[in-house]
């Protein structure tokens, strides 16, 4: 027979093992409570139950109140519908004991027929749509963003002034008088350059001239006047030519009935009465040929 102490020890061992297993496993009661909490939240969402929000506004920040339009006294002549505010039109209808219900156009027509029968011919000028009957506001600023403003402009009506009211200009302004009396003067050298500028435009142009254009002429005194040098030179040397003028330009006669444009600037001096003033010396003829070749090359 086994002693009683050993039996008690064996009985206590399985109890300790069961307690250890129970402590290692999670408690089902806590899991149940968590599951029930989730179900409650889902049921609140399904039912649309939300926490109460403060519907009342803060007393320090009052709500936006509608601006009250001042009602003017009843007029003797009814203005157009687009110049009357809706609230003003309703107040006038109530003053005349008329119905102010419906659209703005309907109330305007009722008031026009009841209180202003003399203006009934103007009924054809009343707009047909409610959009055209809206109140026309003057220029105002609409705030789009903080710090930025956008302006709404109303087109201005252009009024023509009768011709009788336009003042006539009797005396011209001082500025016009100064401009009209201004005279531009140029020196003699600038005038010569301007006159010969057209010749330079036809640098490569050759023109046919009569054969008798290249005739040498000797003065009775043995001197000839060169237009480029601006002085009289001995006429004994050969090669003097007479300048030909055609189409407002001076030409130097050349061989075979041709002519070359004159590029040398003439002197601003006049010859004596007994000398011809359209002759060119041989040196100037040679210089003009060289200048023409350089321009062509």
UniProtKB/Swiss-Prot annotation:
Q: Name one GO molecular function term.
A: chromatin binding
Stretches with biased composition (Basic and acidic residues): 43-63
Q: What segment(s) does the record annotate as region Disordered? A: 1-77
Q: Does DNA damage show up as a keyword for this record?
A: no
List localization entries. Nucleus
- What keywords would UniProt list here? Developmental protein, Nucleus, Phosphoprotein, Transcription, Transcription regulation
Alphabetical list of Pfam families matching this protein: DCR, Dppa2_A
Q: Which GO terms of type biological process are on file?
A: lung-associated mesenchyme development; system development
Positions where Phosphoserine occurs in the chain? 211
Q: In terms of one coarse class, where is the protein primarily found? A: nucleus
Compositional bias ranges of the Low complexity kind: 23-34
Q: Does the keyword Transmembrane apply?
A: no
Tell me the InterPro entries matching this sequence. Answer: Dppa2/4 (IPR039590), Dppa2/4_C_dom (IPR025891), Dppa2/4_central_dom (IPR025892)
Among PANTHER family, the record links this protein to: DCR DOMAIN-CONTAINING PROTEIN, DEVELOPMENTAL PLURIPOTENCY-ASSOCIATED PROTEIN 4
Q: What does this protein do?
A: May be involved in the maintenance of active epigenetic status of target genes. May inhibit differentiation of embryonic stem (ES) cells into a primitive ectoderm lineage.
Q: How does it assemble?
A: Interacts with DPPA2. Interacts with PCGF1.
- What is this protein called in UniProt? Developmental pluripotency-associated protein 4
Organism expressing this protein natively: Rattus norvegicus
């Amino acid at each position: 027979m086994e002693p009683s102490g050993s039996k008690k020890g064996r009985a206590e061992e399985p109890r300790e093992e069961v307690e250890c297993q129970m402590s290692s496993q999670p408690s089902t009661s806590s899991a149940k409570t968590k599951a029930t909490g989730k179900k409650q939240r889902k049921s609140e969402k399904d039912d649309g139950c939300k926490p109460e929000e403060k519907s009342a506004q803060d007393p320090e920040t009052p709500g936006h109140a509608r601006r009250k339009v001042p009602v003017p006294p009843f007029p003797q002549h009814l203005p157009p519908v687009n110049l009357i505010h809706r609230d003003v039109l309703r107040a006038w209808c109530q003053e005349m004991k008329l119905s102010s219900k419906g659209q703005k156009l309907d109330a305007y027509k009722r008031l026009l027929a009841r209180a202003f029968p003399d203006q009934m011919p103007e009924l054809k000028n009343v707009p047909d749509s409610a959009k055209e009957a809206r109140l026309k506001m003057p220029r105002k600023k609409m705030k789009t963003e903080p710090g930025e403003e956008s302006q709404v402009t109303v087109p201005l009506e252009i009024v023509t002034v009768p011709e009788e009211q336009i003042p006539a200009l009797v005396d011209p302004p001082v500025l016009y008088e100064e401009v009209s009396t201004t005279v531009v003067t140029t020196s003699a050298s600038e005038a010569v350059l301007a006159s010969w500028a057209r010749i330079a435009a036809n640098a490569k142009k050759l023109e046919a001239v009569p054969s008798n254009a290249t005739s040498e002429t000797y003065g009775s005194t043995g001197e000839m006047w060169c237009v480029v040098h601006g002085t009289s030179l001995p006429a004994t040397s050969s090669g003097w030519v007479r300048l030909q003028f055609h189409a407002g330009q001076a030409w130097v006669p050349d061989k075979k009935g041709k002519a070359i444009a004159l590029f040398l600037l003439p002197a601003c001096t006049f010859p004596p009465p007994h000398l011809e003033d359209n002759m060119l010396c041989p040196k100037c003829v040679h210089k003009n040929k060289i200048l023409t070749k350089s321009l062509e090359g």
